[in-house]
């Protein structure tokens, strides 16, 4: 009886697991669920994720099927003696070469995605970013995200200018807390820093994740191709308030107008109407 029980157990629960995995996208249980990535690179990461999931699923079904067959066949006759083997050179070669071949295929298949994400330069650094790019500095600190933008209308033509801007605050800079605005359908360049401990910049809908390390400035490239608001969270345990270190990334059509709006609110003194320059005042130069 116990043999039949264990045979059924190792046969039924894999079937249940496969059914649950099959219906999970429709129930919004799956990761990344039924929400498509909002970046082109994120969509390629999803394709890679589902490819690996498919390979693992086929392997799981084959392994559990073989186990169920052996259990069922062995439970028919309790008097039948088992066959003991001290190993098979041919089998060892097969189950070494096949997994190695699968891993090699995955490694080669993902090289292009990994190159775009971590290796390949997005621009010629001697020339600089395109004027349409957004450049912003994001500083993680317990327990919030501090964002600094260059003054509205600022255009960097070389990376030397970007480094000079990052080195210190400048007149006309725009600041925000826990709210990052980015161009829709244009590349965004973020320089990520930490003011205290290790944090992690994580936007699930964009499939973007990067640790923020104290003493380092790490650049992140991504392009948001869907309008909307996306949750920004810290994915590294950073202290007692880690749970509330949340923000938002919003993709907008007219980023310069949004930055101008933020600048007006930032300069508002409670008396002078936003968007006006007080008499005698002049705008200072920006990098």
Model-identified regions with their sequence ranges:
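Hydrophobic alpha-helical transmembrane signal-anchor segments
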Residues: 9-15
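Non-transmembrane, membrane-proximal soluble domains of secreted or membrane proteins
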Residues: 2, 17-50, 71-287
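Transmembrane alpha-helical segments in integral membrane proteins
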Residues: 59-76
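N-terminal membrane topogenic signal
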Residues: 1-9
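Alpha-helical transmembrane segments
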Residues: 46-60
């Amino acid at each position: 009886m116990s043999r039949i029980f264990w045979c059924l157990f190792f046969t039924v629960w894999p079937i249940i697991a496969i059914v649950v995995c099959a219906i999970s996208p429709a129930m919004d249980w799956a990761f990344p669920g039924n929400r498509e990535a909002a970046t082109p690179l994120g969509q390629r990461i999803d394709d890679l994720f589902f490819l690996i999931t498919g390979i693992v699923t086929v392997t799981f079904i084959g392994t559990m099927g073989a186990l169920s067959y052996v259990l069922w066949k062995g439970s028919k006759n309790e008097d039948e003696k088992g066959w003991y083997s001290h190993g098979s050179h041919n089998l060892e070669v097969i189950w070494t070469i096949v997994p190695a071949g699968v891993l090699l295929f995955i490694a080669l298949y993902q090289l292009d995605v990994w190159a775009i994400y971590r290796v390949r330069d997005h621009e010629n650094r001697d020339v600089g970013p395109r004027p349409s790019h957004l450049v912003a500095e994001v500083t993680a600190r317990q327990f919030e995200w501090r964002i600094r933008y260059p003054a509205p209308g600022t255009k960097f033509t070389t990376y030397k200018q970007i480094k000079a801007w990052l080195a210190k605050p400048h007149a006309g800079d725009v600041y925000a807390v826990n709210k990052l605005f980015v161009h829709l359908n244009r590349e965004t360049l973020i320089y990520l820093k930490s003011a205290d401990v290790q944090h992690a910049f994580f936007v699930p809908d964009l499939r973007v994740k990067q640790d923020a390390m104290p003493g380092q400035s790490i650049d992140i490239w991504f392009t948001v191709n869907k309008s909307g608001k996306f949750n920004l969270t810290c994915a590294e345990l950073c202290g007692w308030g880690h749970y509330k270190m949340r923000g938002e990334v919003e993709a907008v059509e007219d980023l310069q107008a949004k930055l101008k709006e933020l600048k007006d609110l930032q300069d508002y003194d409670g008396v002078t109407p936003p968007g006006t320059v007080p008499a005698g005042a002049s705008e200072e130069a920006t990098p």
